[in-house]
Amino acid sequence: MATTWLVTVSLPLAFVVTTLMVTLHSSVQHEVLHGHPFANRHLNEALVFLPLGMVFPYGRFRDTHLEHHRDEHLTDPYDDPESNYLDPKVWAGLSWARRRLLRANNALLGRMLFGPALSVWRFARADAAAIRAGDRAILRDWLLHFAGLVPVVWWVWQAPMPGWAYAIAAYAGFSLLKVRTFLQHRAHDLARGRPVIVEGQGL
């Protein structure tokens, strides 16, 4: 509705609604990979097969996120695929500009502005290397992703909403997700000290 009817009323309003829907879709993907809402995995995954966020293959998100949930690996810069931490030796070898960018990414505004692009770059680079090394499972997930992109791109192509507006809304949706994950984990010597529990309600 946001990309078809609402955009004819107000592009900014349609942009906001599309952003929220992309965010909600990603949140539903997160619930699906944890086995909700149905007992049948295939039925669950059918709900989120189409990549409305356009960037990440669901299968790769599922596998890397479940790996991330292994407590002994949490925040480890080598073993946690979602870690924002770096080995001190790796950090020491980075350029000044790269360090500034990563420092900005450690602030909430920077995480929202730069975090999605940094995540996509790191994720795609690692998967490309794995595919070149012969990982057929990762290749399969990307091929399924591209197949799912076909109807999404077709829909956006024929919809009144400009393609650039949808692409920015998809990025903005990812930015909103970065708010939730910003203070989700912290560095700690013990695995049990790494998850962050936010005790409160509302915003």
Could you tell me what each predicted segment is?
Residues L43-N44, E82, L108, Q158, ...:
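Residues in and immediately flanking transmembrane alpha helices
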Residues F38-A39, R62, A92, V198:
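Generic, ordered loop/turn and secondary-structure boundary motif
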Residues A39-R41, D87-K89, R125-A128, H188-G193:
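Short alpha-helical linear motifs
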Residues Y166-L203:
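Extended hydrophobic/aromatic segments used for targeting, binding, or gating
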Residues M1-L24, V28, P51-A167:
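Non-catalytic, topology-defining segments of multipass membrane proteins
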Residues G35-F49:
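Membrane-interface motifs of alpha-helical transmembrane segments
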Residues S26-G35, F61-H73, R180-D189, L203:
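Histidine-centered catalytic micro-motifs
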